[in-house]
Amino acid sequence: MNSILERIAKHKLEEVAVAKKNKPLHVLSKQQPGEIRDFITALKSNTSPAVIAEIKKASPSKGLIRKDFNVAEIAKIYTQNGARCLSVLTDIEFFQGHPDYLALAKSKTTLPVLRKDFIIDSYQIYESLVLGADCILLIVALLDDVQLMDFCQLAQELKMSVLVESHTQDELERALRLPTPLIGINNRSLHNFKTDIQLSIQLKQFVPKDKIIITESGINTREDIKLMQSHDINAFLIGESLMRADNIGKALQKLMTD
């Protein structure tokens, strides 16, 4: 891990320690979760691009991305304009997100919702369930193989889906050992934040056909989507290009249709 990812992981450990004091696991685990929606099936259905549309205010590499940031409104717009699923940044320190944003977005959509955060402790998985997450993100670069398997199995026992994210061939091989069909390839390095969408095309050859590849980061245009589809990659996690748009709904439609 490099300095950026180390900083995030270090802060996340502190954040989780505070959360555990404020609401111990035995209290959290007694809270009743709401309806869990099928994230995997939502990405499989029909042949148009399967877009996971992301609600993201800021990032460490780009700073503030969207000033006019209304989570409820954005969730509604994504839902009305063809997104298959939503992704919500819940990290406070580095992405100006908030756990409450997930619950709010879930209440304003019929779509399945991914919690986009840096999971380093099983506590966060129970927390994700209570917040309304239908799917969690596990980042291979943050976790060892035992953690990856334990966290994946725990989330699935709680009926959530798991998207496992990799950036290198080595990370991808580790991701493929997990019992989940959702394989995220992040075109942006979490070490230096450089982006190259060719990475998804290069790594696709190592992914079995029964998996669903989700290409993440750097997908900004209709041409980017067509390029990926020409290589049989049909699921996309898209945030920044939509968040920067004056008209989010039109921007999403433009990505999906000629």
Swiss-Prot record:
Family: Belongs to the TrpC family.
Any single Pfam family the record assigns to this protein: IGPS
InterPro entries: Aldolase_TIM (IPR013785), Indole-3-glycerol_P_synth (IPR045186), Indole-3-glycerol_P_synth_dom (IPR013798), Indole-3-GlycerolPSynthase_CS (IPR001468), RibuloseP-bd_barrel (IPR011060)
Keywords: Amino-acid biosynthesis, Aromatic amino acid biosynthesis, Decarboxylase, Lyase, Tryptophan biosynthesis
This protein's pathway: Amino-acid biosynthesis; L-tryptophan biosynthesis; L-tryptophan from chorismate: step 4/5
Record's catalysed reaction(s): 1-(2-carboxyphenylamino)-1-deoxy-D-ribulose 5-phosphate + H(+) = (1S,2R)-1-C-(indol-3-yl)glycerol 3-phosphate + CO2 + H2O
UniProt EC number: 4.1.1.48
Molecular functions per Gene Ontology: indole-3-glycerol-phosphate synthase activity; phosphoribosylanthranilate isomerase activity
Annotated protein name in UniProt: Indole-3-glycerol phosphate synthase
BP GO terms, sorted: L-tryptophan biosynthetic process
Protein's organism: Legionella pneumophila (strain Lens)
